């Protein structure tokens, strides 16, 4: 009881309170005997654990975002028409600036090369 009253009478400055929490906010802590940053056992640089389920959910989220982007491209390209998920994936991967071979369904068949030779 005496100790409690003595601690209560001591003034606590904000600096002394902040110094007790410094190690909690820095990335200098050690998890499982190795530093957090660059830890090969599933921790990312922010120090959060990333389990396989979370990685799977993130992959699904990225795939869904890619499909939505492809559907938006379909709507713009085909005047508001919708397309299925597989076509949306292909549309999202199509790059009009890429000169390598891409799926033929994306070429405009009224191009002068096709009209002139019948093939490309």
UniProtKB/Swiss-Prot annotation:
Ranges annotated as biased composition (Polar residues):
1-37
The UniProt function text for this chain reads: Participates in the assembly of the viral procapsid in the cytoplasm. Forms first a 12S pre-assembly complex with protein H, and F and G pentamers, then twelve 12S complexes are joined by the D protein to form the procapsid. Internal scaffold protein B is released from the procapsid upon genome packaging. Autoproteolytic activity cleaves protein B and probably facilitates its removal through the pores of the procapsid.
The residues annotated as site (Cleavage) are 76-78, 93-94, 108-109
The protein here is known as Internal scaffolding protein B
The beginning of the lineage is: Viruses, Monodnaviria, Sangervirae, Phixviricota, Malgrandaviricetes
The Gene Ontology CC terms held by the record are: host cell cytoplasm
**Organism per entry:** Escherichia phage G4
A Pfam family cross-referenced in the UniProt record is Phage_B
Q: Write down the top EC class of this protein.
A: hydrolase
């Amino acid at each position: 009881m005496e100790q409690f009253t003595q601690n209560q009478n001591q003034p606590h400055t904000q600096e002394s309170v902040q110094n007790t929490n410094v190690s909690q906010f820095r990335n200098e802590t050690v998890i499982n005997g190795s530093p957090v940053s660059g830890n090969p056992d599933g921790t990312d640089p922010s120090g959060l654990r990333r389990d396989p389920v979370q990685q799977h959910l993130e992959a699904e989220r990225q795939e869904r975002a890619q499909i939505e982007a492809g559907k938006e491209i379909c709507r713009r390209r085909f005047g508001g028409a919708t397309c299925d998920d597989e076509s949306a994936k292909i549309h999202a991967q199509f790059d009009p600036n890429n000169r390598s071979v891409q799926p033929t369904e994306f070429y405009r068949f009224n191009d002068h090369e096709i009209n002139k030779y019948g093939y490309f």
